[in-house]
Amino acid sequence: MYKRQLLNSAKKNLPRSFEIETIKVPGVFEIPITISKYLKKFDAFIALGCVIKGKTPHFDFISQSSTNAIMDLAINSKKPIGNGILTCLNINQAKVRKKKGAEAAKAIVSVLSQK
């Protein structure tokens, strides 16, 4: 829903020297497996997406499993993965948080600059 704003806010906060490739996936649940396919190709990742709570527990399962999988990938690969996946209770929360991609970008830049 707010993919473009998330992506634009992330890109604006990355150094110009970074080579950026955007990879689209069907949904948030597919982000971790897609990152795992590209671990050898890239030094860092930014996961962007939005999950809005509905009337079933699906929101909880997707939010928790994708967050856990992304953290596991980052720890096991020792590569930073900025988590810019919005988990919102309603559309208004998503509107307010649509620039959170910037925080995910700043996080990976910070980790990459550590020695």
Predicted feature residues:
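Glycine-rich phosphate-binding loop
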Residues: I33-A69
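Short, acidic/small-residue loops that bind anionic groups at enzyme active sites
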Residues: D60-T87
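Phosphate-binding/catalytic loops
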Residues: C88-G101
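Short beta-strand elements in bilobed, periplasmic/extracellular small-molecule ligand-binding domains
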Residues: K11-V25, N83
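A charged, well-structured terminal subsegment
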Residues: K98-K115
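Short, small-residue-biased leader/transition segments that mark boundaries at the very start
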Residues: M1-Y2
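N-terminal beta-loop-helix "entrance" segment that forms/cooperates
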Residues: I20-K37
